[in-house]
């Protein structure tokens, strides 16, 4: 994501410059360090989420409604790492967009779509955990595979329609003085939000779903506390299931918290920037964008830390065991984890 000031600093658009990139003031060592850090994040994002995708798709034991949502969220993070972060890395390090205006809009549309898609997925996961913990008797009838597929359709279609519609219609730039001049600069990537669409993006794309998530998880943990007081008096099989559901909710709650921590500064800056006459420093805007990207890097690390089955699946994938016939029926859970 770019800001208006970032474009002004990169190009002398007010005087219709020749569209060439300015000389990069960063030393070779600084650029090498930036490339190394960002490339490392990209590798972890792509590889980690690819492992999650393969694991849930391959092992039959993981074919549950909850994991179907997690699988789709991993696809979102994988696409961000594969299609968005590499081009953003070049732009951030070189201080220039080399890929043209049309691809700039496509890139930004996917960037915006995937970030909103992530939060929609987290809302869906929160709903899934709500029924599993707060209404366990109705979970199997409420969160069926067809219901999850409809949720996923909403998670992908609504952010996609919003992102591509707003960016390609250029409604986001209505009333921004100098925008047409920025477009005339061939090497710029002039995407910024006016007051109306900056507010709309923040409220509809971040604040509202985030508030819903926080409210749902608040209810989940309140119910979990009540369950903890009576859990010892329940039958063993019901006791074990409630413990597993609570642990899953805790892990996914951490995923939600990391997402909000990583993306709130960027979305909040998009909200404030037009009210501050687009005065956000370019380096700050870029740093906040990458802080948001790093959320997709963190997710597979969180899964690896909290889910032993993820680590086992990774080992099986690296050893090539998934190419053996019938290996997809392998049990990924130990006796202790199923109790």
From Swiss-Prot:
Residues 58-67, 128-150, 217-251, 311-339 are cytoplasmic. The chain crosses the membrane at residues 37-57, 68-88, 107-127, 151-171, 196-216, 252-272, 288-310. Belongs to the G-protein coupled receptor 1 family. It is found in: Cell membrane. It comes from Rattus norvegicus. Residues 1-36, 89-106, 172-195, 273-287 are extracellular. One of its GO terms (cellular component) is plasma membrane. Orphan olfactory receptor specific for trace amines. Trace amine compounds are enriched in animal body fluids and act on trace amine-associated receptors (TAARs) to elicit both intraspecific and interspecific innate behaviors. Ligand-binding causes a conformation change that triggers signaling via the G(s)-class of G-proteins which activate adenylate cyclase. May also be required to provide olfactory input into limbic brain areas to regulate emotional behaviors likely via modulation of the dopamine system. Disulfide bonds join 21-185, 104-189. The keyword Membrane applies. The gene is Taar2. This is Trace amine-associated receptor 2. GO terms for molecular function: trace-amine receptor activity. It comes from the Eukaryota. Gene3D superfamilies: Rhodopsin 7-helix transmembrane proteins (1.20.1070.10). Keywords: Cell membrane, Disulfide bond, G-protein coupled receptor, Glycoprotein, Membrane, Receptor, Transducer, Transmembrane, Transmembrane helix. The keyword Ligase does not apply. It holds the Pfam family 7tm_1. SUPFAM superfamilies: Family A G protein-coupled receptor-like (SSF81321). Glycans are attached at residues 18, 277.
